[in-house]
Amino acid sequence: MAHVLARRMLLAAASLSAAFVSSGLAAQTYRDRLPQDEVVYFMLPDRFENGDTANDRGGLKGDRLTTGFDPTHKGFYHGGDLKGLTARLDYIKALGATAIWLGPIFKNKPVQGAPGQETAGYHGYWITDFTQVDPHLGTEADMRGFVDAAHARGMKVYMDIITNHTADVIAYKECPNSSCVYRSRADYPYQRQGLNPGFLGDQVQTAENFAKLTNPNFAYSVTVPKAEANVKAPAWLNDPIWYHNRGNTIFRGESSQMGDFVGLDDLMTENPRVVAGFIDIYGGWIDKYGVDGFRIDTARHVNPEFWAAFGPAMLARAKSKGIPNFHIFGEVATSDIDVALLAKHTRVDKLPTVLDFAFARAVYDTVAGAAGTDTFTRLFDNDVLYEGGVATAQQLPTFLGNHDAGRFAHFVRMQNPKASDDEVLKRVILGHAMLFTLRGVPVIYAGDEQGFAGDGNDQDAREDMFPSKVASYNDNKLVGTKATTADSNFDQAHPLYRAMAKLAALRLANPALTRGRQIIRNYEEKPGLFAVSRIDPATGREVVIAFNTSTAVITRNVEVDPKSRGFRALHGVCAPQVTVAGSYAVTIAPLDYVICAAGAAE
């Protein structure tokens, strides 16, 4: 495998300059695309492809508790890296992806956790050094090579960033060997026992006020291990004064923004010094690599004032570097169809967009589950709640599953334990048809196109694309294939890969599916028809998309624009003419969909 990848890397390097010239149209114009024009492919680099075995241990020596490397354990580094990702760019491009969302690539604390419960920072969310690439994933040159190779192919690069916390370095003397309960501002004020005289609290967010916050021991007695006293970068991050230091969050009330996320050092993002510091950190990555967007981890756990400063600063920084359509989307995790919660973070926090967790839940309920298709009205009718309304909703990244919640195929099997392999495949394809054709920006989670299902959430949903050595991955039954995760899973003939590639091509070829206004046409209070029209913004012509979430054939009349008379099939069987002006008949097989494009008005 290593020599094959090396050859692929050499060929990619040799053709890079030619790509700028010969396939240059996409490469020259990718900056002009709006966020809703993209198809996004998301992966954790450690689990994608191993292009350089020399960096598997991150330059460290010792066992897995020192290096973090153990390819047989689902909670440690497995060897994937930036060189491997670069070598597989053509695979991603052939799928139809136009942007790559790269899991965090910053230097992480290799291993953390209580004795016997240690795991590694393979996922990228335990950062110690915000200024360099994790040595397990490669070098700055590897990052530059990846970004340049993606851009040469007309593909954008989105970085996954964190401002809420760092790795777990700070400890509290009161609870050295256990979880430290959250201590509130009311019970443990900043000026407790005469500390920090004159400090007016974190709600007065001025440099003058925070200059009076000099002692971090207001809630707990803070300590930092000597071996880690200078482990963080930039160096200012090593001072505990820049952190909340109040113990673990309980994910509600003030602890949601001020508590340590499962022990991780929670940054005091109310402090202007922290705000300025992170604007400088992430602005530097834009300057250095010309990346095209940021996914913001744990965005809901950071105070709104931080985002009100950070977001505009990043957009301005990107624009100054010739990146006019920089895409920022925050993680506001929810397991409900709670559009109000998501929208609040675009209005109060001023985040440009957020990941559409409500969309994922709606598809889960209707396609994996058996909820009525009226579920989608709860989702789309509330698009007006977002700052900017439906225009913002068009730019929300939509998804079906991810590395935290789990994979969509897993949800399908959990909700349909007696379903045949064919039914599971049909439900997974139907869910992705919704993902690619309904409003929003579709995000594919790496491995979904190869039928990965996983055993659940988090570590159980982070399988390797390259041959895995994890037993609990390799015993999984994949969807649409006889392969297992013990194999290399980059099969472009896989039925899910082919289905997604076709959907991506349809989406990218039809502006109605990227920039078009969406009109809900039909829905039911049971499994069955859900239909929408997407309107081409240039021609005004509609594309009718109709889904059947039931296990029976359905024939229904769908309301259409009275000017729409003739139709052509983009997918499935479409009647060539309307029944009568304003009414179009569709027949849809079980767990299937049709896409019918109206011609010129008669």
Model-derived segments and spans:
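Short, flexible loop/turn elements at secondary-structure junctions
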Residues: L44-R47, F106, D134-L137, T163-H165, ...
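Substrate-binding/active-site clefts of carbohydrate-active enzymes
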Residues: D32-V39, D46-G284, K288-Y289, F310-K319, ...
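Structural preference for beta-strand elements that scaffold enzyme active sites
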Residues: V40-F42, A99, K156-Y158, G293-R295, ...
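Carbohydrate-interacting/catalytic domains
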Residues: L5-F42, R57-K61, H78, K83-T86, ...
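Conserved, mostly hydrophobic/aromatic
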Residues: M43, I92, L102, F130, ...
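Active-site-proximal helices and loops of the catalytic beta/alpha 8
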Residues: V147, H165, P176, C180, ...
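Short, solvent-exposed loop/turn elements at domain surfaces
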Residues: F48-R57, G406-A409, N474-N476
